[in-house]
Amino acid sequence: REKRSTFIQLPSIHLMPIIMSFTVEKEIVQFNGKLQKLVHESDLTKTSMKVNVFLPPALTKAKVPAVLYLSGLTCDPNNATEKSFFQYFASKYGFALIFPDTSPRGAKIAGEDDSWDFGNGAGFYVDATESPWSTNYNMYSYVHKELLSKLGEQYSLQIDFKNLSIVGHSMGGYGALTGFLKNPGQYKSVLAFAPISNPLNCAWGEKCFGNYLGSDKSKWLAYDPTHLIKEYKGEIPEILIHQGAADSFYSTDHQLQPENFAAAAKEAGYKVDLRIVDGYDHLYFFISSFVEEHAKFHAKYLGLKL
């Protein structure tokens, strides 16, 4: 008889695909590290979002901590990467940098391009509750939840997302203070350059909160750092704030009011090192002049060697 071979069919094995959320549009070598310009689709803003990530040379040895940098009104991820010089010190101390955008782009909402301090470039790091903004303008949850979660998947071998700090400038300084205070334990430290410190009490805050959150000012309290620090429970490391004395938004327009935040922090038993520096304005010349102090401050709380 003819012998027949018997084949046993094994069940097929389906390997879980590695899903990359981000597309690298450009990679630039800088200070022996890499600046990656990324784009991805956001579930919360329902638009394509851009973000820049700087990876220091230290990550060739182990995972590195990261600092989240939130930019101010009219900015996109490129402003700080091109003007702050933060990457030099991130490379020196060994931490990554994350530069999100300041609003959704391409939402095509009527009125979002009508002024420079509202809409495009001015998402104000809130989750909007008012129509038509609530569909796309969810920058608070986008930055502190969705973006960090997706980056955590993308850079799971390079960045330690349990060792984060946060900093910001102007609207971004407000966003950093708010994000730190609303997410206890998520960030090791928080610093700010010329932050909008008491938005309930200034024209920028009234305009953005009124449109994004509605007319009920009690809802605004959830995004006001001066209120949030009064309600905070737990440990807070010293908060460093630099403010230029020649900044017209501070001295003339009274949009920033860091003294209000410092006073509220003191009353609540927390320490704020508010440094009013003569001669400096609101621009990146000011930021780049003091970014080394901020980088060193973050490195300390991230457990890095100084």
Which stretches of residues belong to each language-model region?
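Short, Lys/Arg-enriched N-terminal segments with co-localized hydrophobic residues
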Residues: 1-19
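Non-catalytic cap/lid and distal C-terminal segments of serine-dependent acyl enzymes
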Residues: 21-306
